[in-house]
Structures are given as C-alpha cells and as structure tokens.
Amino acid sequence: MAKFDAHLKCSFCGKSQEQVRKLIAGPGVYICDECIDLCNEILDEELIDSQGGSRQGAEPSRKAGAAQARKSTKPAPTLASIPKPQDIKAFLDQQVVGQEAAKKVMSVAVYNHYKRLAWQGDGKGETEETATRLHKSNILLIGPTGCGKTLLAQTLAEMLDVPFAVADATTLTEAGYVGEDVENILLRLLQKADMDVDLAQRGIIYIDEIDKIARKSENPSITRDVSGEGVQQALLKMLEGTVANVPPQGGRKHPYQDCIQIDTSQILFICGGAFVGLDDVVQKRMGRNAIGFMPTEGRGRGKATRDLQAAQVLRHLEPDDLVRYGLIPEFIGRMPVSAVLEPLDEHALESILTEPRDALVKQFRTLLSMDNVQLEFEPSAIEAIAQEAHRRKTGARALRGIVEELMLDLMYELPSRKDASSFTITRAMVEEHTGGKVLPLPGSERQQESA
C-alpha cells in the first residue's frame, strides 16, 4: 500500500499529502499542518489587538468605576448616627398601621444590630470591654398574608438608608438542582448596592414565604427534600455569618466567572411567612382544644375570626412548635427574635387607606391633581372599601385592587373633561364597583343616540 495518496490535497492551500507533514481529514475536506499554523498566527494577532484596545479603553472606565465605587461607599454607622428604638418605631408608625408589638420587637432588634456594627467598627483599642464579640439576631415574622411583613422590613431599610433585597424562599433549591442557589439572594442585595460590597454588607435581606421550605414531616426523611430541609441547611451559614462567594452573573448559567466575596455576618436577615396551621401545633402542645381559646359562639364564623384567634394562640409560640411545624432546630436557633403579626380588621384597613404617608387615597388624589381634578372620598366610601377588602381575606393587598377597579372609568374620563374640577367618591359607587356608571358625562346621551 502506498504511504501517501497523491489525490488527497489540502482544501485551503491545495498542497498534496506528499508536500506537507500532516493532512487532517474532515467531513469531505482536508487541512494541512501549515494552514493550521497560519490560522493560529492570525487568531493570536487578532487576540492581542483586541486585548490591547480593550485595555486602553478599559483603563479610564476602570478608574471611573473605582471613583464611582469610592463615591457610593458610605461610612460605617456610628453610635451617634443610629436612631433610637423609639425613633424607629415612630417612623414605622408613619408607614405601617397597627402591629404595635411587632414594631416594638423589630425596632429593638434593628437598633441592637446596627449598634453592634458601630461597636465593631468604632476604631477603639482592644480592651476587655471592646473584646466582647456581639452576635447578630435575625428576625422571624409570622403573620397572615397582607398584614405588613414585607412593608415593615422595607420601611426599616428606607429609614436606615441601607440596601434592601427581597427573596422568595419557594424558588430556592439545593446546589445542583433546578432552581435558584441561596447565593443569588446575596447577588440581589449586591445589585441593590450598585455592586458596592461594603455597602451591601450593611444591608437588609427579607426572605418571604419562609414557611414553604419547612420539611413535610417532623421526622427526617430518607428521600431528598431539595426545596425544603435542604434549603434550610444551605441557609444556615449565610444566616449565621460567613464569607460567601457570590457569582456576579448568577452561578448556574455562567459557571466560569470570578466570584465576589461577601461577609454575611453584618447583614440583617428578616424571614417572614404565613405559617398556616402553626396555631394548631401550639394548641396541641398546650393540650387545649378550640374551646380553650375561642368561645362556643365564636366558632363557625368567618376566616377573619379564625385568623384573629390564631394570632392570639401564636402569642404562646415556642421554638419547639416551629420544629414540629417543619423547621430544623439549627435554622430556628439562627432566628432568635420572632414577632407575630395580627390580621387586619376593618378599622385597620380604613386607616391604611388614609393615614400612612403613601396611603392609597393620597396617591389617587395626587394622580388626579395632575389633571387639575380634586378627588374626595366620603367617609362611608372609605368604610365600604375596607369592608370589601376584609371580605376578600387577602389583607391590605386587596385595597389597591378595589380602588383601581373603582377608579378605572373615572381616570379614563376625567382627564378629557374640561368642566370637571372636583369629584367625590360615594358609598354607592363602591358598592356598584365602578365610579363611571354614576358619573354624568355631557354629550353621552347624544353619543348613545348617534350610535
């Protein structure tokens, strides 16, 4: 057999197999070693040119980025700059209606947390007093949907002027499974801080729906619970305080990237959840049936009554009850501060509509004032909106949906009306679920006749 086949040639330079050292075959094509070397040289030259240009262009941007980072980095809190618990609660009162016990608990916990940060970074010499290490106390909020758990955490971050990130525990899974890694929570906080690590390390993270990662039974299971107990295990070190490696582009879609290190020991974690059925666990532990907490005439009423009774039962909550519910003891130990939020009654919903700084009534008044229309709500209309929201049983979240539905026709018609300078919402409009049906529109009869 011949050593070389004269019919085989390089598809690029045309040299035969005899004229080159190596001829590599592909699907219907051939390439010689000389062409491969030439291709490598071309690629190397283009790579060097592109890197040189990027370096020249990136140098000023890097300097600008460093300057921006220095500009955005805020100094560490000092003892004098931290608001006192009473001041914190007074600020919460402006935004959150009710929940007095929860606001008091959170005010003290947040004050102690940032006082701890100031104590560690005050620059004093090492003494017997300053050598004492202060450990942080994360917060667990328990309450029905729409009672103000997220708003409490968000208002605290607004007052302290620190980055605030919200995460959903239901999307978290263990590493290696479909879903989000726990490190993505830190990435959201870092993004809120404009990638300023020092600022992010003084921020607040709120993890919602934390009750959804409770394991299905109190006893350990032989099957893998990747979104329940597994997530609790993954969150332990982050809650306690560790130096976590955070991929700036997300870890699963971009595995090959430099990670940013964040120390979580200074981040305040607030976890919230509805914990449906937890009151039954407490009653079972205390050995009392429903009669012990609810009179006979109170049983059989609506969901609002049951939620109120559940909040009263949860005042006797102990850590062992959370273990029976499905949280592992190690996780509970890292959430030493807990607060139970009560369901909102009709009176509280009326206050939410009018009293807070960003109340819904004030928001819609501002919107219509831009169209030179003065909007008013009759007290009976406010009462009717609160009653409807209470009937829907979704807390304060129902208020916006009701008002949006009520204001749809008005906000469609009034901006085009030149003769409308004021408008009043009545109870009848609320009960009919629209303001447009009772709004007299000039020319509407002529439009109907022409139609």
Curated annotation (Swiss-Prot):
GO terms for molecular function: ATP binding; ATP hydrolysis activity; ATP-dependent protein folding chaperone; protein dimerization activity; unfolded protein binding; zinc ion binding. GO terms for biological process: cell division; proteolysis involved in protein catabolic process. The keyword Cell division does not apply. Keywords: ATP-binding, Chaperone, Metal-binding, Nucleotide-binding, Zinc. It holds the Pfam family ClpB_D2-small. InterPro entries: AAA+_ATPase, ATP-dep_Clp_protease_ClpX, ATPase_AAA_core, Clp_ATPase_C, Clp_protease_ATP-bd_su_ClpX, ClpX_bact, P-loop_NTPase, Znf_CppX_C4. SUPFAM superfamilies: Glucocorticoid receptor-like (DNA-binding domain) (SSF57716), P-loop containing nucleoside triphosphate hydrolases (SSF52540). Residues 50-80 are annotated as: Disordered. The keyword ATP-binding applies. ATP binds at residues 144-151. Zn(2+) binds at residues 10, 13, 32, 35. One of its GO terms (cellular component) is HslUV protease complex. Belongs to the ClpX chaperone family. NCBIfam families: clpX, PRK05342.1. ATP-dependent specificity component of the Clp protease. It directs the protease to specific substrates. Can perform chaperone functions in the absence of ClpP. Component of the ClpX-ClpP complex. Forms a hexameric ring that, in the presence of ATP, binds to fourteen ClpP subunits assembled into a disk-like structure with a central cavity, resembling the structure of eukaryotic proteasomes. This is ATP-dependent Clp protease ATP-binding subunit ClpX. It comes from Synechococcus sp. (strain WH7803).
